[in-house]
Amino acid sequence: MAALIPENLSREQCLYLAKLAEQAERYEEMVQFMDKLVLNSTPAGELTVEERNLLSVAYKNVIGSLRAAWRIVSSIEQKEESRKNEEHVHLVKEYRGKVENELSQVCAGILKLLESNLVPSATTSESKVFYLKMKGDYYRYLAEFKIGDERKQAAEDTMNSYKAAQEIALTDLPPTHPIRLGLALNFSVFYFEILNSSDKACSMAKQAFEEAIAELDTLGEESYKDSTLIMQLLRDNLTLWTSDAQDQLDES
């Protein structure tokens, strides 16, 4: 369990301790240090690119392990249901509820920071897209496990956040920019996994990939690795999604 952190830490100390926690793979504490840094620095000031990336890494690791846990528990729940083992099903459902509460808390934490501090503090197109994309990501993580009206609301909030990010990205960031590419990647995943709209997912991923390929020679050395990695992920998803569609055609 992450410990309470000292009250009187400076911005530099928070940054150093967040990096230390990252090295030690203590991501819950990394989140605490970055939360404190954000609350002390924004919305009056803006995070540096390094701080912004550390915040993203901290939350991504915490939410990543919870999402993985949720998928495993849900899969076990289905197996127990197929075995008609009522006692086990009851225990697994309760445990899944516990994981879902933690997921909700983590998402609520970062979404509050984004809404109150980070989006209002953003002055550049790059940082605006970064934070709006992040907002979309965490609403999407809620949509992965919520049901009924809560799922509908989370999906709506995801769509609004990604669309707001996309409007700025398409106007102000080049097609090869890693943040614009990352947005296209995650937005297309949202269409595929949450909205079950494989056509829209494929067309969005394909367009982003092709536009980036056309301008590949303009890529600076500093973002070449990031951009080409995301382009590879876009292509992997396209291959997977189109083969899925083909499988369904073969079956029907």
Curated annotation (Swiss-Prot):
One example of a Gene Ontology biological process annotation: protein localization
The name this protein goes by in its record: 14-3-3 protein 10
Coiled coil stretches, renumbered: none
Domain of life of the source: Eukaryota
Subunit organization: Homodimer.
Alphabetized Pfam families for the sequence: 14-3-3
InterPro entries: 14-3-3, 14-3-3_CS, 14-3-3_dom_sf, 14-3-3_domain
Family statement drawn from the similarity comment of this UniProt entry: Belongs to the 14-3-3 family.
Organism: Solanum lycopersicum
Transmembrane regions: none
Gene: TFT10
Gene Ontology CC, one term: cytoplasm
